[in-house]
Amino acid sequence: STEPTDGGIYRGHRGRMEIRVDMHGVSCHGSAPERGDNAIHKMAEVLLNIRDLNENPADGSTEINGLVKMLDPKFNPEHYEDARFLGRGTCTTSQIFYTSPSRCAVADSCAISVDRRMTAGETYQSCLKEIEDLPACKKYAKDVKVSMYMYDRPAWTGHVYETECFFPTWINKESAPHVQALIDAHHALWGTERIGADEKAMSTRRGRPLTDKWTFSTNGVSIQGRYGIPCVGFGPGAESQAHAPNEITWKQDLVTCAALYAAVP
């Protein structure tokens, strides 16, 4: 992958999935809200639970164990070391929707989108169950539905190839042959440290390990995560610049990357 790597060689990153939570209620006139069942109010409790799931510790001191638990061998015995390298999973509410007859009525439905970043040891099934097991979702079990979004946008031909909005975590050992090939080429060309065109570039590179991982998601989730084709990353630019309104890519990075690609056997 040639996504930005800040002068580093990246051997994996967290996966992600897109979750939808639907809450049903009963509408009524806003002058007597007690006659209805406000779906937005019920969803508000779910929103707070999702915040807690992302932010809480996992030491048993809170009702909801936070996602940091996957860095602990007690919760993630097979994959905790990879999880510590990739970083813990996260979740955040990214969208909210509602239906209501008017601004003077109780909302009869509310839905949210949840952006879920997944570390090693997490599956889409486990992530859905975490949401289903939130106290608020259990409290309103008969009125709540937790699901995964499906991608169904038509192609230019009009054909629809429906697929789940789930993009698997992927990681390689540093000793993997395709990773080591890039490391060896970098060592031969420029040594063991990240390089950059100027001080602005080096300000985010200096002191960081040459071999690392992305924080965001790349096409590696399909190349290796979904299809098992070995993938490794070395690309021009910086992660912090990606999708920014003033995004830049250093010309020297383009030259550096082209040289390394040419040097890889």
Predicted regions and their residues:
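Acidic/histidine-rich catalytic neighborhood of metal-dependent amide-processing enzymes
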Residues: S1-E18, A83
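Metal-dependent amide/peptide-bond hydrolase catalytic core
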Residues: E18-A263
